[in-house]
Amino acid sequence: MGERDEDTLFRPGFNRAVRVEAARSAVTDDAGALLLREVAEQLGYDELAASLLDHRAQHLVKHPLTELVLTRVLLLAQGWRDQDDADALRDDAALRLAVSTRRGTAPLEAAATALTPEGLASQPTLSRMQGMLASELNRRRLAAGVLERACARMLRAHGRRDEMTFDVDSFAYDAHGKQEGVAYNGHYRTECFHPLVAYSDTGDLLAVRLRPGNVHTAHDVRGFLEPMLPQLRTVAKKVWLRIDSGYANGQLLAWLQHRGLKFITRLRNNPALSKEAKTWRERTLVEWKKGPADDGRPRQSTFEYWYRSKRWTRVVRVIAVLVERDYAHGELLHHEFFLATNAARREGTSDDILARYRHRGEGEQRIGEFVNDLAPTLSSVTRSREGSVAHKRPVGAGENEVSLLLAALAYNLLHALRCLVEGELGLGISIRRLRERLLKAGALVVRHARQVTIRVGAARAELWAVVGRLLRTAAVAVTEVHA
């Protein structure tokens, strides 16, 4: 068959025998969405979507709410961050199969009626869904769904543990245009939102809450924590919280003590803290100045005492930490910081508390993944399907919080799948690498009379076989739990 120039997309100059054209058969770059949908089924995402309030006239609904939620979550998980991407991917066979609530080959068939979905929902439809989910009731249910499904995964993977640790932190979420809640943050020096986020020591995202950009780090942290506590206690008998110095105020620490949480927080350096540790510090530095450690490694030393700030109602256990930074040309450099905890010594020595706190960096890495790899777009105005500005209505804070909550569901899908892969391969893997190696798989979609075959490339076939086996085993475990 002869070539037609109008079909040619690209012909490289380095090899004119190569010709690139658009596939006329059903080809997808997102076969991994089918794996994610399987994980979503096991975690009960369909049940969560069914619990959300849908105020549309159901006899006129073309795309069920469950399909709309799955569309947005799976697109985010696959790396499609803009709602507009749904229009470009409307006919992608793997995505149509993954988001549909219909079985068999029905998701790929032509619409039988005007109300039968044919392809993915359009950008305007997804935008209206997000507005519908922005009601206070739906946001509460979404937030509860994020937490409940994260805890369910942890229980399924680890059982009820003796103890768990979770981190609370905030981050700057850059925003542009006229949006409710966007404000200048002096610490981050940018116009942004200032959300709170909580992560478990297993890497699961527990909660996220949108806040105005100009609020203090600790603003409403008690209101953020309170709904989580009953659920977290189903996961572990003892719950530890790690927080940074921005949260270390007397009222919050007293409340954490009252609610039965073990906390470890960093304290801002101040003269009073330093004075208490002066003798220990001087003695330690005298010893260190005798010469570097025999193995050449930086040394550290801890010292603990009881301390109460003038603004606090009770004393806390403080651990002063001295860390050697460098030793060159006879000059010793060091760094000093302070931790506070309500844990008794029988629950952890100074070194134990320090080691536990240092894992906080892992939570910060998870935030980086959430922001950089999920990165939901927070639109400033409502747009038409063609992308032109329809009108200048600012998007409400509720709608932007929905964006973060849906991104949290997408993150936890990816993390649940990552945990399966890591357990099998015995090595850590980032979300970006997970997409590259597994999810962003090119495949040929072959439709038969009663079934659909997805043919992935040979380079990914072995890993797909492994993950398929793991998901089948996980599905059996879920069935046994529900039996």
Roles of regions detected by a PLM:
Residues 253-262:
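Short, surface-exposed basic-aromatic patches at helix termini and helix-loop junctions that form
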